[in-house]
Regions:
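Basic/aromatic-enriched alpha-helical hairpins
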Residues: 1-43, 47-49
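Conserved tyrosine-mediated DNA breakage-rejoining catalytic core shared by Y-recombinases
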Residues: 154-195
């Protein structure tokens, strides 16, 4: 995504690394502050929206360029042998702005229970199932499947028994473990799971049959969630609230420690990168933690 933004900035597909200077990076940062947000990130057909780019992107994209620049210097320079093919150090003068903390988007345990208890809207003849019903169901599924993202619901293709295995779309290209996650289908959501299971077996869920791409699927979810938000009195309820709520309730109500919550969210702790190579990941401890969260509800 950062590279795509850089290509839009320079208006060409190639860039000599010597052109990346502190002045260049400041110009790129200023460009990001005025560039609109783009949709279609996961489908390769990104198009501009009428929304401004968030502060997180303005910090994150330059940090990605810095990482690439540093890796290139490690690859092509050898100071011990006097080989310095990339002499510039633009990030000594250009300081990447710190990534702002994500605003908490958790709803209360009572509001989550309200969503679970909401009655479905009736079908409209010839109009298919209301997006209200879809949004309610997938929000609950996400909450119960460790905050699974909509792009992963759309993309997941591996299931064995009651275990879904997927590589998180958002981060799989940035991690050595492909951001692999294994989630267990709890009894409470078995009927919902069966409702949306892919009858062809090509993927885990049938959402890809209903919607052209993951972005359209996510958009429809958020349309339905706006109506649900009005009922439970949450302004601008969005799909990501499910993930935040799962994590918050796990820690605050179910007594799951913060380290385990981080694992439930499939985050990667850079300080444990070496340990990850030697220690096989045990997903069952995450399922046990998730069981504690499920037991908070009727």
């Amino acid at each position: 995504i950062a590279i795509n933004a850089l290509v839009r900035f320079i208006k060409k597909d190639t860039l000599d690394i010597g052109e990346i200077t502190a002045s260049f990076m400041r110009s790129f940062e200023n460009y990001l502050k005025t560039e609109p947000s783009y949709k279609g990130r996961y489908t390769g057909g990104a198009v501009a929206t009428d929304k401004p780019k968030g502060k997180r992107a303005v910090s994150l994209y330059p940090s990605r360029i810095r990482t690439i620049h540093n890796l290139a210097k490690l690859e092509y320079n050898d100071e011990d042998l006097g080989i310095v093919r990339i002499p510039l150090s633009p990030f000594a003068k250009f300081k990447v702005a710190p990534i702002p903390k994500t605003k908490h988007r958790a709803i209360t345990i009572e509001q989550m229970q309200q969503i679970i208890d909401l009655p479905y809207k009736e079908y409209v003849r010839g109009g298919g199932e209301p997006v209200f019903n879809l949004a309610k169901d997938v929000f609950i599924l996400s909450f119960a499947l460790l905050g699974m993202n909509s792009a992963d619901f759309y993309d997941a293709s591996v299931i064995s028994g009651n275990i879904v295995t997927y590589q998180r779309v958002k981060t799989r290209t940035r991690r050595d473990d492909m951001a692999e996650m294994k989630v267990r289908i709890e009894p409470e959501i078995k009927k919902l799971f069966d409702k949306y299971a892919d009858p062809t077996g090509e993927r885990v869920f049938s959402f890809y049959c209903r919607y052209k791409n993951a972005d359209i699927f996510n958009k429809m979810l958020n349309i339905g969630l706006k109506d649900i938000g009005k009922i439970i009195e949450v302004d601008n309820l969005q799909y990501y609230h499910a993930r935040h709520t799962m994590a918050t309730l796990a820690n605050n109500k179910a007594g799951v420690d913060m380290y385990r919550v981080d694992e439930m969210l499939n985050h990667s702790d850079s300080s444990l990168k070496l340990a990850r190579i030697y220690v096989e990941r045990d997903f069952s401890v995450l399922w046990e933690a998730n069981r504690k969260v499920m037991d908070l509800f009727n």
